[in-house]
Amino acid sequence: GIEAVSPHTGYGYLRRGAALPGGYALDAFVEKPDLETAQGFLADGRHSWNGGIFAFGRERLLDELRTHRPEMARLCEAAVAQGAQDGAVFCPAQAPFAEIEGDSIDYAVMENTTRAAMVPVSMGWSDIGNWDALREARDGASTGPHELRDCTNVMVDSDGPRVCVVGMDDVIVVVDGDDIL
């Protein structure tokens, strides 16, 4: 768990339980609380931010999915069973994979499990989970040759060619060699 330094409604929170060697049992996991709840978490001193860093054995994760999201587990297993190996890359089968209901591991497993622990850390951490956080992490700067006209919330990252963006909002343009996103 990351040391919580402010009440943030965009992060998950971990409540420390009983001490374990090197960490704590996870007493509770709450994903993205409202502001009043986040303020209470910060005040009680027992909560850390979820840094999104998880370590599972394959079977443990599948057991948790089978327990808390059985349909998701079934589709994951089907996608793997029907998937294909291409050199060092494994591609799950598209049809069962596409049927999996969108849900994060935070909601699907971590809020429900009784078999989790946490290790508290204090480090330079930032959740680059939205455009504002990315902009803040980059000091708001676009990089590479660019020109923005009549734009809001636009970021450019180019390693070569000049990028011009006109009259657009809420986009990021990335140029990496011959690839453009």
Predicted features along the sequence, with ranges:
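Left-handed beta-helix
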Residues: 58-181
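Conserved core of the sugar-phosphate nucleotidyltransferase
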Residues: 1-99, 117
